[in-house]
């Protein structure tokens, strides 16, 4: 790390912060700054703050980074770097930390003196996060003090001030995405976990912690071997061609190159690539350079050693890369990104640098490891022969006509429209659902292809074997665009390919097989957004003459809350009335309160939590020795089962209170982190209702004397008189219901399949469908308790 520190010699102070312009525009045009206001943009807020923490690690200062998703979907990111500067900026007269969070583009990334390898301008978005957050709190641990500052929708509400002393250093940023801006504010654990794990592979010197208070999950990532362990992870369940994971590292013209790769007994090339910790989904010059360097090294060494004598035609670079899994990670001083998603590296000099580092290393490596070279060459020869065989197989299949243009499978119920952009095809599981779908469809533009036979497990099959399967043959001939290298999107007969399967395990399995097939053999269809999954409803709800279809449990809860909004009210003991939106907000708060209280009890025990709440113990109490003494005395009096001790925590500048339960042999610690947690603060503030309360719904009335019963009672009232049907499969619906819920473009829901995470999907498919039993068993055991319906 000393080497990296020497590349960032300038002091990180207020003068290192450069300001470009003000913040006015961000809330009006958020998509200009974060891409969109949907799920992607929402998570982009986390990446902006996380990237700042990682830049501190890359510069050689941070060793620990933690991300916490709180129960209200707010997020905290903390690092132990230098801490954002708090001194007054010479030009603006404001603290530097205030500039970072209130002035667009104020940051230390414009001048490479402070950060040599930041992700372009990714790290300067703290002000954008602030502008798009309902609230944001920043704490800086620097020079032995804890500095705190708070904002609301980008405006300062709590100026920078000192709240305590500490031996810690670093920055802690907590923020809650603004529901006035975003379509959804639900943070997805899987999305955050994937990014944090990715960063942990790329930064082996840093320990990452991820906590989700909603799910009770806590994960720690520290990968000492870095991207070698990512290669191992991607190859889980696959059989390696040779044991070694080959590692190439080098530096030239300020570009740092780090590559790890291994071959497996498979037919696909997988390359994951990164520049300055940013995933380059579309690859770029660094990937081109690696491919070229690898292919040249293998082909030239094979020719020199006459390893491919039996091959009439020479093998190609593509043959060399069959079965390759590689991770290419580069650090580039001034990266230029291009492509649709701005995730393709365009710097031309990087191609030559990566190619020469790769070629030089491998020629030397293969000299010493002839057995590894021989294994790669034999696999490339096999790939070249298979390529020729596949070509012949496709020609043979075409001659036999099922894939010939214009010849359609007999079971296809086609549509009359000939413009592909207006046509859609439903791939429907089973005969019964297929029959209903044929009756339900709009024949003008909707085609139905029932799939009744066994779909081949394409995990281990090459294209010639895949094409011998009747169901696959029917799909390929119906779509009309060819398969594999021959796929021509201009010949595609339908621009919406919709997978329609049951929500049960069998349906999920068939959907998985179909998705695997598209990923492996027709990836362009997924890349261009032609593949969709139908989302039939889970419930049909009928009340009187009113009948509606509901997608899932969450939507059902929203539906019931809407009923309560219209028909319910609550009056507390002081005759304060709640109705409409105010009542719904109160019920959501009550549910959150109960969930938070249960989480606290699970963490620290009921007696202890009740004591802390009764005596209103707060974070600042632990910084006051007299108050700590008072609290411990009260504990000894009221909680006879515990032995109480205290210990001064120099890092936090506060006391820890430690409880020993000698009967159970357990130890519980109450510290400032627990008392400052969102869950504890939420429960401590409580719900301001005076009991008992009167609950009214339509003509019903009941008196309730417990906060915990109010939400459930309203839900029971809202459900009464409803006829609720839960669907298990498509076959349970008649044609009219199937049309209304799943096929009518005006009322249905479709989910577009994205290829963004093709490598992860590929990995899961391999574990679930590959030949190695042990990884599959481990995967199913790990997830069986967490999922009700296995889905992809």
UniProtKB/Swiss-Prot annotation:
Main location: cytoplasm
Thermal profile of function: Optimum temperature is 70 degrees Celsius, active between 37 and 90 degrees Celsius.
PROSITE patterns: TOPOISOMERASE_II, TOPRIM
Entry binding sites for Mg(2+) 2: 502, 504
Matches recorded under Pfam families: DNA_gyraseB (PF00204), DNA_gyraseB_C (PF00986), GyrB_hook (PF21249), HATPase_c (PF02518), Toprim (PF01751)
Keywords carried by this UniProt record: ATP-binding, Cytoplasm, DNA-binding, Isomerase, Magnesium, Metal-binding, Nucleotide-binding, Topoisomerase
Residue numbers binding Mg(2+) 1: 429, 502
Coiled coil: none
Keyword DNA repair listed: no
Entry-linked SUPFAM superfamilies: ATPase domain of HSP90 chaperone/DNA topoisomerase II/histidine kinase, Ribosomal protein S5 domain 2-like, Type II DNA topoisomerase
Cellular compartment(s): Cytoplasm
InterPro entries in alphabetical order: DNA_gyrase_B_C (IPR002288), GyrB (IPR011557), GyrB_hook (IPR049353), HATPase_C_sf (IPR036890), Ribosomal_Su5_D2-typ_SF (IPR020568), Ribsml_uS5_D2-typ_fold_subgr (IPR014721), Topo_IIA (IPR001241), Topo_IIA-like_dom_sf (IPR013760)
Catalytic reaction equation(s): ATP-dependent breakage, passage and rejoining of double-stranded DNA
Molecular function terms from GO: ATP binding; DNA binding; DNA topoisomerase type II (double strand cut, ATP-hydrolyzing) activity; metal ion binding
GO BP field: DNA topological change; DNA-templated DNA replication
One term under GO cellular component: DNA topoisomerase type II (double strand cut, ATP-hydrolyzing) complex
HAMAP family: GyrB
Protein family: Belongs to the type II topoisomerase GyrB family.
Designated name of the protein: Type 2 topoisomerase subunit B
Organism of origin: Aquifex aeolicus (strain VF5)
Gene name, Swiss-Prot/TrEMBL: gyrB
């Amino acid at each position: 790390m000393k080497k990296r520190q020497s590349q960032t010699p300038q002091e990180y102070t207020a003068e290192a912060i450069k300001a470009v312009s003000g913040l006015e525009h961000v809330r009006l045009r958020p998509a200009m700054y974060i891409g969109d206001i949907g799920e992607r943009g929402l998570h982009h807020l986390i990446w902006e703050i996380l990237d700042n923490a990682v830049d501190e690690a890359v510069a050689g200062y941070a060793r620990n980074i933690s991300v916490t998703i709180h129960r209200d979907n707010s997020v905290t990111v903390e690092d132990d770097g230098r801490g954002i500067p708090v001194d007054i900026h010479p030009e603006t007269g404001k603290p530097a930390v205030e500039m970072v969070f209130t002035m667009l583009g104020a940051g230390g990334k414009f001048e490479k003196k402070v950060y040599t390898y930041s992700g372009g301008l990714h790290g300067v978005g703290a002000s954008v996060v602030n502008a798009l957050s309902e609230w944001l709190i920043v704490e800086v641990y620097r020079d032995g003090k804890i500095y705190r500052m708070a904002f609301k929708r980008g405006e300062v509400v709590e100026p920078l001030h000192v709240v305590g002393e500490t031996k810690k250093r670093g920055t802690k940023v907590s923020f809650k995405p603004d529901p006035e801006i975003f379509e959804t504010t639900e943070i997805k654990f899987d999305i955050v976990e994937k990014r944090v794990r990715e960063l942990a592979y790329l930064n082996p010197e840093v320990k990452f912690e991820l906590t989700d208070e909603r799910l009770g999950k806590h994960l720690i990532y520290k990968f000492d071997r870095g991207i070698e362990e990512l290669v191992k992870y991607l190859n889980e369940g696959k059989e390696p061609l040779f044991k070694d994971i080959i590692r190439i590292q080098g530096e030239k013209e300020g570009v740092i190159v780090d590559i790890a790769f291994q071959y497996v007994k498979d037919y696909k090339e997988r390359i994951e690539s990164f520049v300055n910790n940013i995933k380059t989904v579309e690859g770029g010059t660094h990937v081109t350079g690696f491919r070229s360097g690898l292919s040249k090294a293998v082909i030239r060494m094979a020719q020199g050693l006459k390893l491919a004598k039996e091959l009439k035609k020479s093998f190609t670079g593509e043959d060399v890369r069959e079965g390759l899994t590689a991770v290419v990670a580069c650090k580039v001083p001034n990266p230029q990104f291009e492509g649709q998603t701005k995730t393709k590296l365009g710097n031309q000099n990087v191609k030559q640098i990566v190619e020469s580092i790769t070629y030089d290393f491998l020629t030397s490596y293969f000299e010493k490891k002839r057995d590894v070279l021989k294994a790669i060459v034999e696999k490339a020869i096999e790939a070249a022969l298979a390529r020729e065989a596949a070509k012949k197989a496709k020609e043979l299949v075409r001659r036999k006509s099922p894939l010939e243009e214009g010849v359609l499978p007999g079971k296809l119920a086609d549509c009359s429209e000939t413009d592909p952009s207006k046509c859609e095809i439903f791939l429907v599981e089973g005969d019964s659902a297929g029959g209903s779908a044929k009756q339900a469809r709009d024949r003008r533009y909707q085609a139905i292809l029932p799939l009744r036979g066994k779909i081949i497990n394409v995990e281990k099959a090459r294209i010639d074997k895949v094409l011998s399967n009747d169901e696959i043959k029917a799909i390929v001939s119906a779509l009309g665009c060819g398969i594999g290298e021959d796929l021509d999107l201009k010949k595609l007969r339908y621009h919406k390919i919709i997978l329609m399967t049951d929500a049960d395990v069998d349906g999920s399995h068939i959907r998985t097989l179909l998705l695997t097939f598209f990923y492996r053999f027709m990836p362009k269809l997924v890349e261009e957004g032609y593949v969709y999954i139908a989302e039939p409803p889970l419930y049909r709800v009928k009340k009187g003459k009113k009948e509606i279809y509901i997608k899932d449990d969450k939507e059902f809860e929203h539906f019931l809350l809407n009923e309560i909004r219209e028909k319910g009210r609550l009056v507390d003991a002081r005759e304060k009335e709640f109705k409409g939106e105010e009542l719904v907000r109160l019920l959501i708060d009550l549910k959150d309160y109960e969930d938070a209280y249960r989480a606290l009890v699970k963490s620290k025990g009921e007696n202890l939590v009740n004591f802390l709440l009764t005596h209103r113990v707060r974070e600042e109490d632990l910084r006051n020795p007299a108050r700590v003494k008072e609290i411990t005395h009260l504990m000894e009096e009221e909680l006879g089962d515990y032995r109480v001790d205290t210990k001064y925590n120099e890092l936090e500048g506060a006391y820890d209170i430690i409880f020993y339960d000698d009967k159970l042999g357990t130890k519980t610690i109450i510290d400032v982190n627990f008392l400052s947690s969102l869950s504890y603060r939420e429960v401590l503030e409580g719900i301001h209702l005076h009991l008992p309360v009167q609950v009214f719904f339509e003509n019903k009335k009941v008196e309730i004397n417990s906060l915990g019963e109010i939400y459930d009672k309203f839900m029971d009232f809202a459900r009464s008189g409803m006829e609720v049907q839960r669907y298990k499969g498509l076959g349970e619906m008649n044609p009219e219901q199937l049309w209304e819920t799943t096929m009518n473009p005006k009322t249905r829901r479709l989910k577009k399949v994205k290829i963004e995470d093709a490598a992860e999907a590929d990995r899961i498919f391999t574990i679930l469908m590959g030949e190695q039993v042990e990884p599959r068993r481990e995967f199913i055991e790990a997830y069986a308790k967490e999922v009700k319906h296995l889905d992809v």
